[in-house]
Amino acid sequence: DIAGLIRGASRGEGLGNRFLANIRETDAIVHVVRAHGDEGVVHPDGRVDPAADIEIVETELIYADLEQAERRLERVERQARGGDRVAIAEEAWLRELIDALRAGRPARTVPPPADAPRALAALAQLSAKPVLFVANVDEGSDVEPDAVAAHARDQGAVAIAVSARLEAELAELGSDEAVAMRAELGVGESGLKRVVDGAFSLLDLIAFFTAGEDAPAQSLHMRRGLSAWHAAGKVHTDMQRGFARAEVIGWEELVDAGGYIAARERGTLRLEGRDYVVADGDVVTIKFSA
């Protein structure tokens, strides 16, 4: 959770350097943008302009990336002059990247070439990270403002709308009351679910469950397209090392059957090998040798 960046953060203004260092460690950025008109919440600039707020943060990320890319270019130029083919490819990309950053375009618009794999690790660019824009809207609205939606489309990002005030009020209610209030206001899914779904989509993640007839269920996540062997490693390295097979069933099938015994009788519980690609919502029981 990182407080809003101010102008000059890339030069160390406020707590800029600390905030930027924190952002550098993340897989993605969830950028919460004010889009509500509550006069009781003071804006530092005395206005409500989500597009301008987005620009302030993105500009600081771009400035930080530009400074780092220019320093990196100085080192790579020396290696390229020595005939290092990887450095030559990276130098060309860095020059293209620097031109884009100087023009105000984020690093995610200039992906590195396949033959310069060390570039991304060396730079850890802030503006290359995938972004989920969360427009904090007035109560009763679940549509992101046009300015936020348009900016997300231009940047290849994802945008959703959440009313933080409404979510705080609903959190104080019982589940049935909360559902009734959402229906009355015309607001569908909870804000938390929309944020989680947006983040999973942005990072191309799936959720799977580990459970057994005598084991508690837990939810885990991993990149889409990974195998049962990778899923075993998410649970415990011993399971991955001694992987034998996996019992797999979709969670809806398991709920519909009413449990493992009935699912096995129906034939919906299946055995899969290490290369089985785990699907979103799978319930996986790892069989392994110690």
Mark where each language-model region is.
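Internal, well-ordered alpha/beta segment that forms a basic, Gly-enriched binding/recognition surface
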Residues: 55-67, 71
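C-terminal-of-GTPase-core extension/linker across diverse P-loop GTPases
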Residues: 70-290
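Conserved nucleotide-binding/hydrolysis micro-motifs of P-loop NTPases
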Residues: 3-6, 34-40, 47-51, 62-63, ...
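Switch II of P-loop NTPase G domains
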Residues: 2-31, 36-59, 111-123
